[in-house]
A protein has these predicted regions:
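Alpha-helix N-cap/helix-initiation motif
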Residues: 4, 99, 103, 198-206, ...
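Active-site-proximal, well-structured secondary-structure segments within enzyme catalytic domains
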Residues: 9, 14, 18-192, 240, ...
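A short, flexible low-complexity segment enriched in Lys/Arg and Gly/Pro that occurs
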Residues: 1-9
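Short glycine-biased active-site loop of nucleotidyltransferases that positions the nucleotide triphosphate
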Residues: 130, 198, 235-239
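Active-site recognition of the HExxH zinc-binding catalytic motif
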Residues: 16-23, 114, 192, 197-223, ...
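The catalytic-center signature of Zn2+-dependent metalloproteases
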Residues: 222-247
Length: 253
């Protein structure tokens, strides 16, 4: 009754037919035509190299966790026992780190890093229409000029989509000689602040914020005025995560 196997088989067959119709031998080759990795063999070689490098460390970590748990672990057990081991060995947990990461301080640090890296200044603008009182609006300034803006919607609330993401509100473009500057949405689901207290983030939250801001900067700092290739547009899917992971590094240093 709940077996999706026939549906998946039909999707696979239709994708294969789609690829054949436009001259590719299989759907993998078709999907990679617009990626940095140009062939399935490139992808497999990359994955095999990653496995070769990572497997010894993963096996050692799993053995350590199983020794701690005193039993064999299934995949769904690993996160739970990793957190328990961390608490026992280092007396630390994500929750214990919250007092060190109030959101105002994290934003100040993030904006400071961005300023030093890219020579810009991020300034909040008041009086902009927003869809919820928690939402804030910021301009990015460079050489006394605004070059882009973004909405920041940081907190979880009822009926809000879960997760964290960046999306483009307006892409940079120039039509008829008039330049339109980029605007982005930066959305997270952090624990809301208590009364008269700032929101306190876990370190995982901090990494998430830096990650999504990397996507935002990719969109907002573009100097290209053609919509199809400005910012995140026209970038291969296997390259689009580069700015976000680059920014994550600064959440650790």
């Amino acid at each position: 009754r709940y077996d999706n196997t026939p549906v998946m088989q039909a999707i696979t067959a239709l994708r294969h037919e789609q690829a054949n119709l436009v001259g590719f031998r299989n759907y993998a080759e078709y999907a990679l035509a617009t990626r940095m990795a140009k062939s399935p063999q490139d992808v497999l070689e990359f994955l095999h190299a990653m496995v070769k490098a990572a497997r010894p460390y993963a096996q050692a970590e799993l053995a350590e966790l199983e020794q701690f748990a005193n039993r064999k672990l299934a995949a769904w057990d690993v996160g739970y026992f990793a957190e328990k081991l961390q608490r026992e060995r280092y007396a630390v947990s994500q929750e214990a780190l919250r007092p060190y990461f109030p959101l105002p301080r994290v934003l100040a640090g993030l904006f400071g890093v961005i300023g030093r890296l890219f020579g810009v200044e991020i300034i909040e603008r008041q009086g902009v229409a927003v869809w919820h009182p928690d939402v804030r609006f910021f301009d990015i300034h460079q050489h006394a000029n605004v070059i882009g803006s973004f909405y920041l919607d940081p907190y979880a609330r009822t009926n809000k989509r879960s997760g964290a993401w960046m999306d483009d509100c307006v892409g940079r473009h120039a039509l008829g000689g008039e330049l339109t500057l980029p605007v982005a949405y930066l959305v997270c689901n952090f624990l809301p602040p208590a009364t008269d207290q700032p929101a306190l983030l876990t370190h995982d939250d901090v990494v998430t914020l830096f990650h999504e801001f990397g996507h935002g900067l990719h969109h907002l700092l573009t100097r290209v005025s053609y919509p199809s290739i400005a910012g995140i547009n026209g970038v291969s899917w296997d390259a689009v995560e580069l700015p976000s992971h680059f920014m994550e590094n600064f959440a650790w240093h």
